């Protein structure tokens, strides 16, 4: 087909679509309707009357489907709300229930005090107009899409002595917006949390893209690795905060010179594994240096400190129970991705509170992959035979005895971490009484004695239902079982945590 024929076809399709949209607008404008609304607890419910095909339903100003709207009505009626006779619910076939509160009808007004009966028509006119414009752009401007696609794969040319950057495919920027947790707003049926299969189990690339820096730029960003820029230290090296010329803040991990040769394997492992993963609950690799006597790993900067800092109150605030539950679920999602959804199974081997970083919005990110190993590649292989590495208190006892590394070793560490988050105590506290020095044993004894409230960190600032606490500790003890056969996998742990979260939400609404 020639270019003129193709243009003519697009023009005809556009004209026909526009005509259909105008007819729909005319039909909508000719109908008469008005808005009925009610407020119950935290939800503002509105719909256009009389009910007909295409009526608009909203909860808190957000358009929703009729099914969700009816679920919200059913929820509020079951919890004692009474709606006036003018607020009809015949379309939901809900039977009226006695309740405790009377709801006043509120008129929905826009910023210009327009009449309610015109609001629905205006909404549909706006939607129709937007759809018409979008179709015109899609049909008439294919060159725009091609140009954007071409530009999205550009890679900056490398300079001499520059930082290696990961591939643009693996580290492509994204404008992803992380959904708010249901604990950060009053819960309602219009904000039902997503299922574990859809929530953070798949890769979620960071907004940050790959970097291409020279050593001169890195020295400038860190003040020549000044002590004032130091933000942490681990087995691999010292971590510095770096501020780039464009204002972007990064974390730069510098290998210790005294262990330079011995840590070559850890460096290569961390770079290789980080370059192949992308998940919102894992720290993102931006680049690395392996030249001369310098080995550097550059990652995104997570400025709200470590989980251990917050448990200690070192950041000025203490974590409440809601935040602790959020963090546990985030860490679980990150590990589930590593074990089950990454290109190849990855075993972290060093899950601990100081390797969990928190964002300003208290999202948790798993960091420090220096000890990480790829899991078995053969379906017949059950484990990796390797030297024991990790942190005392979090180490899987079966792994220490047999040198057999599996993903269940991370599960054990997660169980210890869960006890730490709930109690606020470190895994090993040598200054305590003999029967309290090993935190997981002390917690297990208290749990069996039915004294679960004595286990909770007093800084949690909330008295949680005993059943919720028992479920949390029971899950922690399952994960920290002595042998891997007794431990669940991280995906099963995630499902249990989601069930606990649902129970917690229901009780918080009672």
Curated annotation (Swiss-Prot):
GO molecular function terms attached to this record: ATP binding; protein serine kinase activity; protein serine/threonine kinase activity
Region feature Disordered, mapped onto this chain: 166-209
Taxonomy, superkingdom: Eukaryota
Family: Belongs to the protein kinase superfamily. Ser/Thr protein kinase family.
Principal subcellular localization: cytoplasm
Residues annotated as signal peptide: 1-30
This enzyme's EC code(s): 2.7.11.1
Name this polypeptide is given: Calmodulin-binding receptor-like cytoplasmic kinase 3
Reaction equation(s) it catalyzes: L-seryl-[protein] + ATP = O-phospho-L-seryl-[protein] + ADP + H(+); L-threonyl-[protein] + ATP = O-phospho-L-threonyl-[protein] + ADP + H(+)
Modification sites for Phosphothreonine: 214, 386, 391
Positions of modified residues (Phosphoserine): 354
Regions of compositional bias (Polar residues) in chain numbering: 166-178
Protein kinase domain mapped to chain residues: 225-499
Any single Gene Ontology cellular-component annotation: cytoplasm
Region of interest (CaM-binding), ranges: 240-265
Phosphotyrosine, modified sites: 399
Sequence positions that bind ATP: 231-239, 253
UniProt keywords, alphabetically: ATP-binding, Cytoplasm, Kinase, Nucleotide-binding, Phosphoprotein, Serine/threonine-protein kinase, Signal, Transferase
SUPFAM superfamilies the record matches: Protein kinase-like (PK-like) (SSF56112)
Assembly, per entry: Interacts with calmodulin (CaM) in a Ca(2+)-dependent manner.
Enzyme class label: transferase
Record: active site: 350
Keyword Chaperone attached: no
InterPro entries attached to this UniProt entry: Kinase-like_dom_sf, Prot_kinase_dom, Protein_kinase_ATP_BS, Ser-Thr/Tyr_kinase_cat_dom, Ser/Thr_kinase_AS
Subcellular location(s) of the protein: Cytoplasm
One Pfam family hit: PK_Tyr_Ser-Thr
